[in-house]
Design a protein with these regions (language model features):
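ATP-dependent adenylation/nucleotidyltransferase module used to activate substrates
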Residues: 1-143
Length: 143
């Protein structure tokens, strides 16, 4: 029986580290990034670069390429949400606050229900994989 996982990959440190762990623990890895109109595009670019590098070399800790699965990677566009979400982090929102992350500054950077939206989508993908394969499919979020 193969072990499957669907991971939400933002391109930040937490989800990138989680991806490496999933490569060690699972037979199939599906990584999904979300383009929701975020101003900080660098994380999406880093996620795509990381997947390309890992799929090219498929080497982690000096082991052979056969030791780790190829990453199935998708970017899901949620740009229809951009106009509906009130946050400094999305295109069209207020400026991202500078300086210390005081409580008032933090409020401006919250994207309402973002992680729940991501979790719902990766859960749906995992359920589809489980239905197709007849095997369990886990979800992983490095948030």
């Amino acid at each position: 029986m193969e072990r499957h996982v669907v991971i939400s990959l933002s391109g930040g440190m937490d989800s990138s580290t989680l991806l490496l762990r999933c490569l060690k623990e699972y037979d199939t890895v599906t990584a999904i990034s979300f383009d929701y109109g975020q101003k900080h595009r660098v994380e999406l670019e880093r996620a795509q670069s990381l997947v390309k590098i890992l799929n090219f070399f498929r080497l982690v800790e000096g082991k052979t390429k056969d030791a780790y699965p190829k990453i199935n990677y998708r970017v899901i566009k949620l740009d229809g949400l951009t106009d509906l979400l009130n946050s400094a982090l999305v295109t069209g929102g207020d400026d991202v606050p500078e300086g210390h992350y005081a409580e008032e500054n933090m409020k401006a950077t919250v994207v309402p229900n973002r992680n729940k939206i991501f979790a719902s989508i990766i859960q749906a993908v995992a359920l589809s994989i489980a239905d197709k394969t007849g095997e369990q499919c886990d979800i992983a979020m490095g948030i």
